[in-house]
Design a protein with these regions (language model features):
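Short helix-initiation/N-cap motifs at beta->coil->alpha
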Residues: 60-70, 166-172, 246-260
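Hinge/lid segment of periplasmic solute-binding proteins
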Residues: 87-146, 172, 198-202, 285
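Extracytoplasmic/periplasmic solute-binding protein
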Residues: 129-140, 145, 155, 169-221, ...
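Glycine-centered hinge/linker elements that transmit conformational signals in sensory
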Residues: 172-178, 217-248
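Extracytoplasmic/periplasmic substrate-recognition and gating elements
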Residues: 49-50, 77, 133, 157, ...
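Short, solvent-exposed loop/beta-turn-alpha elements that line the ligand-binding surface or hinge
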Residues: 105-120, 164, 206-231, 278-279, ...
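Paired acidic/hydrophobic, glycine-rich loop segments that form the ligand-binding mouth/hinge
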Residues: 82-85, 264-269, 285
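Conserved N-terminal structural module of periplasmic/extracytoplasmic solute-binding proteins
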Residues: 8-11, 22-98, 110-116, 161, ...
């Protein structure tokens, strides 16, 4: 309910920053599909029904990559949407795009809209805030990496359905038992570079790039050949060869395989929950990202995922007034 309230507030805030004559359309491009796409459409309907001056028009523009690419092309062509949802991977690109965006904090303050960044977890607000303290975009669907498992499949394999694996050795052991019980896809992962590299490293209190993961300089280099990283990917490769781990593709290609019941375990985004809750026809459980218990400092914390709303520049001056 809190996320719904904040998202609706964002829509109202941005929608209030356009002229008040004839109904003005506010184009909102996003990458929310399935259950989350329905959620976005419902938010727009609620706002549109609350007044008659403005109309938010949500448009699904494909995956995060596709939506961002479309947004950049549209800006260059002079027909960018008013609002675009950009995943956290594209945050640095958007921050560096001077002249392409209008800081969300500025849009809201210019409109006389009171906005309190402390409504968010500090790490989330800080991620989208400039050094001068101004929020550049409005966090919409911040997420983190988590672990989902099929309780019914666990029971069939003789595993404790109320005791999800907490460590990677336990995951691989459970995957082997699921395979032995006849499951064709015991374990998979979505967003592999995020879940198995970025968050994996942070979860183990380990750097994955030089220059303090790039925060201390733009000449950073990946450092994913450490003993821990090599060990983990060797374990994944071994599991892949024996069929207990099934790679489903890049990005979120694996997402559908869990709620459908095809795969019994998956590491992915907390954002997948809405789809799992809506589509899964089996009992499921959720836990934290697995870790190697012998690594000092683990578990620690994971990387922020999800996306935020950016206001595009190039619109008529009056459209930014409330």
């Amino acid at each position: 309910m809190q996320l719904k309230k904040l998202a609706l507030t964002a829509a109202i805030a941005f929608g209030a920053c356009v002229p008040a004559h004839a109904q003005t359309e506010i184009q909102w491009w996003h990458s929310m599909s399935a259950a989350l796409g329905d959620w976005v459409n419902d938010l727009a309907k609620q706002y549109n029904a609350s007044q008659t001056k403005y109309k938010i028009v949500p448009t699904y523009k494909g995956t995060y990559d596709e939506s961002m690419t479309a947004g950049i092309a549209a800006f260059r062509a002079g027909n960018a949407p008013h609002i675009i949802q950009v995943f956290e991977v594209g945050t640095a690109t958007m921050m560096a795009s001077k002249g392409a965006i209008v800081p969300a904090g500025k849009v809201m303050s210019d409109a006389g809209f009171k906005f309190d960044p402390t409504s968010y977890v500090s790490a989330v607000a800080g991620y989208y805030t400039a050094p001068n303290g101004q929020m550049l975009s409005y966090p919409l669907n911040s997420s983190t990496t988590i672990f989902y498992y099929n309780k019914d499949a666990f029971k069939k394999a003789g595993l404790d359905a109320n005791k999800p694996p907490k460590t990677w050795p336990e995951v691989f052991e459970a995957a082997s038992k699921l395979k032995a019980s006849g499951h064709s896809c015991p374990f998979t992962t979505s967003w592999i570079s995020w879940t198995q590299l970025e968050s994996f490293s942070l979860w183990h209190n380990t750097l994955f790039a030089s220059k303090n993961n790039g925060f201390d300089g733009t000449d950073a280099q990946l450092q994913i050949n450490t003993p821990l990283h090599v060990r983990h990917f060797e374990n994944l490769a071994k599991a892949s060869k024996d069929g207990s781990f099934v790679y489903k593709g890049r990005g979120n290609a694996a997402d559908a395989s869990f709620p459908s019941g095809e795969c019994a375990m998956i590491t992915g985004s907390s954002g997948l929950y809405a789809r799992v809750a809506k589509e899964a026809k089996f009992a499921y459980g959720i836990s934290t990202l697995p870790y190697y218990a012998d690594v000092k400092g683990a578990p620690q914390n994971t990387a922020i995922g999800g996306a935020s709303l950016w206001v595009m520049a190039g619109k008529k001056p009056e459209e930014y007034k409330g």
